[in-house]
């Protein structure tokens, strides 16, 4: 697997992520079982975005010193594009978490605890998936066409899909988990497991954590191939992906109260997936530059938010009338 990642870059990335996670977990422990406020969520979202941009700037500077601008510019642009793609697709993941917490009636104070472990699990699972994907691409380059076709199909499916939280409990996976886990009927404070009559029982909070992890894996199956359309370098794919999901918990609490105001977002994300799928399928006939890909993705997101704002304005105006 060809990569610009050197031991220094890998080590620096690991140190930054470890320190930030330790600070985040330390603050989580001090606050106890309290919901993250909108102000805290906004502050942490800003921290993670700023840290990601600073890392990319340091990454660019390092490559300029060691490889020159000819290498540094496209690699830093690839990181930024991958980060933007993952960050935008992660919003849909956040809305699924909101549905899960709503269906299982998880209090806001406990949602934070679930998401702490959910994000930690996502880091491990996505790291495994990215290195596996990089190895597969290095051995079988035709697999990019499979990724492209899959993203094209997923984009169309996303645009046509209708989410309904009322049917979550009837999903085969949920029924299977409930049937194979010794589980209590109610949430017991912040515990994932409790003992009753000498037996260990999982609480509904554990079921929610499992579903949060599985939902992230499902979304990673979309987002990781999308970043491989930009670059196959495992260092850039992994760092851009993980920096994007590290801020997911803060993003959740930032958007949780206004989820219904983003009704048009899934269509914008669907267009992004279709574009990336087509980009991967035509790569042998026409190579779309990274700068163009970044511009297209950013442009789609801007147009989506403009349309969304217009739709919300129309709805609010109709309510007043």
From Swiss-Prot:
The keyword Cell inner membrane applies. Residues 1-6, 65-89, 135, 220-225, 283-286 are periplasmic. It is a multi-pass membrane protein. It comes from the Bacteria. GO terms for cellular component: plasma membrane. Residues 28-43, 111-113, 157-198, 247-261, 308-321 are cytoplasmic. Its main location: membrane. The keyword Flavoprotein does not apply. Keywords: Cell inner membrane, Cell membrane, Membrane, Transmembrane, Transmembrane helix. The chain crosses the membrane at residues 7-27, 44-64, 90-110, 114-134, 136-156, 199-219, 226-246, 262-282, 287-307. It is found in: Cell inner membrane. Has been proposed to be a redox modulator. Belongs to the TerC family. This is Putative membrane-bound redox modulator Alx. The lineage of its organism: Bacteria, Pseudomonadati, Pseudomonadota, Gammaproteobacteria, Enterobacterales. The gene is alx.
